[in-house]
């Protein structure tokens, strides 16, 4: 019987499952190397942790690792129901809150090694977390994609730690009771982007679609479709970072000015940015809550030991 120790949290409604122990040791000098080792040689552990019968499509996993840089608190590898994620904003906030719950870190600044580079997070005395994300930028403005059943859809392509297609004009109500229509539109758009060869830099696949609408209590409300056809319950940290990059590129948000981003559930992140050459450095503040501590058991006699 194999055992995997976990602690679960949610950030603005979006869950994170932090794996503390039980996964195989991963070789590699960088977090990208370790992610590749997990993906290529031990992917069944991701499936066992996140897929049914132990998990669900909406779960995001975070594997706690020893850091690869001397001044980092830890390393982390993010993954979901279909594969691996370079960076995860809500997951980093959940990671920090979970480590604090376990007594492993105190309020203050902490560096985290990720597969796309180091990020910094500040745990505040009130329990909120400010993430200093990887540099973000808009790659392409007003790209057009033909989406079957919806016609021409216009959006910006931006990097915020993952690749996003950001759509302001879509004709849909961005409300929780309209998730089915939002999901169908977003998935169709994501598929059309791939089929028509519309990508991020260096041919990178755009694996997130972000839709926007007005919100009475925030600067904007979004709906984010993630890889694996699961929508983000939070305002999405990397998605908010991509939005900040587009706002900065359009001259609509000044350096240091706050942007309040609401998600589909009504939860909110507060963001701002600093300029770094051709990029911006996003800062995202949110809060996570611990929901469970558990030991997952993997019985190799179980036909669904490694997920369904």
Curated annotation (Swiss-Prot):
EC number(s) recorded for this UniProt protein: 5.1.1.8
Gene Ontology MF annotations: 4-hydroxyproline epimerase activity
Active site: 88, 236
Protein name: 4-hydroxyproline 2-epimerase
PANTHER family per UniProt: TRANS-3-HYDROXY-L-PROLINE DEHYDRATASE (PTHR33442:SF1)
Catalytic activity: trans-4-hydroxy-L-proline = cis-4-hydroxy-D-proline
Gene source species: Chromobacterium violaceum (strain ATCC 12472 / DSM 30191 / JCM 1249 / CCUG 213 / NBRC 12614 / NCIMB 9131 / NCTC 9757 / MK)
Binding site for substrate: 89-90, 208, 232, 237-238
Keywords assigned by UniProt, alphabetized: Isomerase
Biological role stated in the UniProt entry: Catalyzes the epimerization of trans-4-hydroxy-L-proline (t4LHyp) to cis-4-hydroxy-D-proline (c4DHyp). Is likely involved in a degradation pathway that converts t4LHyp to alpha-ketoglutarate. Can also catalyze the epimerization of trans-3-hydroxy-L-proline (t3LHyp) to cis-3-hydroxy-D-proline (c3DHyp), albeit with 19-fold lower efficiency. Displays no proline racemase activity.
NCBIfam families named among the record's database cross-references: PRK13970.1 (NF010577)
Family as reported in the entry's similarity comment: Belongs to the proline racemase family.
């Amino acid at each position: 019987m194999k055992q995997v120790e976990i602690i679960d949290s949610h950030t603005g409604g979006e869950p994170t499952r932090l794996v503390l122990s039980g996964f195989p040791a991963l070789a590699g000098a960088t977090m990208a190397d370790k992610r590749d080792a997990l993906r290529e040689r031990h992917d069944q552990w991701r499936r066992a942790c996140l897929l049914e019968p132990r998990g669900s499509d909406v779960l995001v996993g975070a594997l706690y690792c020893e850091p690869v840089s001397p001044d980092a608190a830890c390393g982390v590898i993010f993954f979901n129901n279909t594969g691996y994620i370079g960076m995860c904003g809500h997951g980093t906030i959940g990671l920090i809150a979970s480590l604090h719950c376990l007594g492993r870190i105190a309020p203050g600044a902490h560096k985290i090694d990720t597969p796309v580079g180091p990020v910094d997070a500040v745990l505040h005395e009130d329990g909120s977390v400010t993430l200093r994300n990887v540099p973000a930028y808009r790659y392409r403005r007003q790209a057009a994609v033909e989406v079957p059943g919806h016609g021409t859809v216009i959006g910006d392509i931006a990097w915020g730690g993952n690749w996003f297609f950001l759509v302001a004009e879509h004709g849909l109500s961005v409300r929780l009771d309209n998730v089915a229509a939002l999901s169908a539109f977003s998935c169709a758009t994501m598929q059309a982007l791939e089929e028509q060869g519309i990508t991020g830099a260096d041919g990178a696949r755009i694996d997130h679609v972000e839709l926007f609408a007005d919100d009475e209590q925030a600067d904007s409300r979004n709906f984010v479709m993630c890889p694996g056809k699961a929508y983000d319950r939070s305002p999405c940290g990397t998605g908010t970072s991509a939005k900040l990059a587009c706002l900065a590129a359009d001259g609509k948000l000044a350096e240091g000015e706050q942007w309040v981003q609401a998600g589909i559930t009504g939860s909110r992140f507060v963001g701002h940015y600093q300029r770094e050459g051709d990029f911006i450095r996003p800062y995202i503040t949110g809060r996570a809550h611990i929901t469970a501590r558990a030991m997952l058991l993997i019985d190799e006699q179980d036909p669904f030991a490694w997920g369904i």
